[in-house]
């Protein structure tokens, strides 16, 4: 009888490679539906807002560019970030920011949306943020350090803006009392 041949069993098929992890989805920017916003301002407030709005109208058309919306909002006492302004505008491109114009009736729901935002920092939040830079624990921060922070972190300010903001705030040692500074900023 012939010797038995070793019959090799076919190798098991290699395990399929794991499916690649799906690319992380970009967090969806929730759009603000301005048409659904209920205007809660009094007639007197609306008249005041319109008066301020028209001060920014450079052409006499009773319209402002999208790039001016943040300035008007801030002039009216709100403190939205640039990101919040862009969000309420529908995230327009830089070209649209300078080219597109809106009327007061389009601006009012934006003002209401920003006013409804409860996440805006208050006096204590700003003081607490600056206290981090108070190395001596004496209520002051170095003017040079504050300039650097304002120009390089978060929503970066231009050097001219920083200088205008800090004008008259430093003492003879180059230090700034940050509680007085925050009061000054919030009153402007």
Curated annotation (Swiss-Prot):
- Specify the EF-hand domain's residue ranges: 44-79, 121-156, 156-188
Q: Which residues carry this modification: N,N,N-trimethylalanine?
A: 2
The yes or no answer to whether the keyword Transmembrane helix is present is no
Q: Does the keyword Nucleotide-binding apply?
A: no
What GO biological process, any one, is recorded here?
muscle contraction
- Molecular-function GO terms, alphabetical: calcium ion binding; structural constituent of muscle
Put simply, this protein is called: Myosin light chain 1/3, skeletal muscle isoform
Q: Which organism is it from?
A: Mus musculus
């Amino acid at each position: 009888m012939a010797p038995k041949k070793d019959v090799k069993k076919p190798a098991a098929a290699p395990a399929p490679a794991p499916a690649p992890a799906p690319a992380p989805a970009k967090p969806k920017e929730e759009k603000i539906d301005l048409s659904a916003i209920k205007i809660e301002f009094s007639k007197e407030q609306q008249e005041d807002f319109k008066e301020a709005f028209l001060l920014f109208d450079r052409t006499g058309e009773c319209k402002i560019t999208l790039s001016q919306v943040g300035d008007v909002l801030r002039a009216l006492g709100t403190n939205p970030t640039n990101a919040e302004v862009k969000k309420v505008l529908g995230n327009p491109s830089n070209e649209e920011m300078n080219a597109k114009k809106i009327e007061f009736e389009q601006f009012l729901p934006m003002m209401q949306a920003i006013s409804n935002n409860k996440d805006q920092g208050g006096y204590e939040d700003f003081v607490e943020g600056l206290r981090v830079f108070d190395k001596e624990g004496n209520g002051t921060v170095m003017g040079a350090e504050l300039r650097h922070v304002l120009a390089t972190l978060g929503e970066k300010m231009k050097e001219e803006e920083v200088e205008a903001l800090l004008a008259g705030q430093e003492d003879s040692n180059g230090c700034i009392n940050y509680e007085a500074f925050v009061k000054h900023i919030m009153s402007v």
